[in-house]
From Swiss-Prot:
Species whose genome carries this gene: Neisseria meningitidis serogroup A / serotype 4A (strain DSM 15465 / Z2491)
Protein name: Porphobilinogen deaminase
Encoding gene (name): hemC
Note describing how the cofactor binds: Binds 1 dipyrromethane group covalently.
Pfam families named among the record's database cross-references: Porphobil_deam, Porphobil_deamC
Cofactor(s), names only, from the UniProt record: dipyrromethane
Pathway terms, separated by semicolons: Porphyrin-containing compound metabolism; protoporphyrin-IX biosynthesis; coproporphyrinogen-III from 5-aminolevulinate: step 2/4
């Protein structure tokens, strides 16, 4: 099938537009006669910058306006960072493809310190993620963790203005924007296990658009899809959102998936970990199995306590 025109809905931040243009380029290469446009949009998540995401409704704030454009036909597909996509999509929407994953890890960015472990007592680290906060507080209790919102450029400017001694950002975003030079170190899994889907792009469509599944199929990366499916199944089983300090990271080797999961308290006092392996075709079941291990260790009670504190 050779489409004549496709419209991509995207947030207007530099990173989101890079992602949309990346998919635009892939589609133009696949379908040279197709006109591929980008519809830039401002979302509620882009507008609310004075509160942490966990307190204003979560990362779904970054996708609702894009979904409305899909629903009313202004756009054919929307490009998202998968880690920003709620675990349960609204009825009538579907993820048609998940692209090959870039760097899934977090990056340490500082103008003063080369490594996280070099930071002295009371040094201020910025992050908007409860997932990162829980892990950093557990491993580095001497550091002060403070909220950090805004797009990548805004966050870097806050660091450069001296509001923070260091900040933690997704490595993939910095690399996509050619800001690799700002990265002092990539955090290990033991320092900061990634969020479900981190580093991967997802393509969302209105579920009834059966014509698009075949069109977008070449953009899907099988291994990444299996890994992200396992990660999202884990998070979904535990009610994961950005209001919960939850991490899930899956790797694949010779068709075998290894999934690592984590649930913590934002103050770092409790961090639960679990892992398991399964063939790639059982990705969803693997996610649920690791979620059960975490639940058996008290993850649901911990998540309930965190949500009660947040509310």
């Amino acid at each position: 099938m050779n489409p004549k025109k496709l419209v991509i809905a995207s947030r207007e931040s530099l990173l989101a537009m890079w992602q949309a243009k990346h998919i635009q380029g892939r589609l133009k290469a696949l379908y040279p006669d197709c006109e591929v446009e980008i519809l830039g949009m401002t979302t509620r998540g882009d507008q609310i910058l004075d509160k942490t995401l966990s307190k204003v409704g979560g990362k779904g704030l970054f996708v609702k306006e894009l979904e409305q454009a899909l629903y009313d036909g202004r756009a054919d597909l929307a490009v998202h960072s998968i880690k920003d996509v709620p675990m349960d999509l609204p009825e009538g929407f579907a993820l048609a493809a998940i692209g090959e994953r870039a760097n899934p890890f977090d990056a340490f960015v500082s103008n003063q310190y080369a490594r996280l472990e070099e930071m002295p007592e009371g040094a201020v680290v910025g992050t908007s993620s409860l997932r990162r906060e829980a892990q950093l507080r557990a491993r580095y209790p001497h550091l002060l963790i403070k909220p950090l919102r805004g797009n990548v450029q805004t966050r870097l400017s806050k660091l450069d203005n001296g509001e923070y001694d260091a900040i933690i950002l997704a490595a993939a975003g910095l690399q996509r924007l050619k800001l690799d030079g700002r990265i002092r170190m990539i955090l290990s899994e033991s320092d900061s296990l990634p969020a479900a889907g981190q580093g991967a792009l997802g393509i969302e469509i209105a579920a009834h658009r059966e014509d698009l599944y075949e069109v977008l199929k070449p953009l899907n990366h099988g291994v990444t899809n299996a890994c992200v499916t396992a990660e999202r199944a884990l998070a979904r089983a535990l009610g994961g959102s950005c209001q919960v300090p939850l991490a899930a990271y899956c790797t694949e080797e010779n068709g075998l998936l290894t999934l690592r999961g984590l649930v913590g308290h934002p103050d770092g006092s409790v961090v639960l970990r679990a892992d398991a392996q399964a063939p790639a075709e059982y990705a969803d079941a693997l996610g649920r199995a690791v979620a059960k291990k975490l639940a058996d260790d008290g993850a649901r009670e911990l998540i309930g306590a965190v949500l009660n504190t947040e509310n």
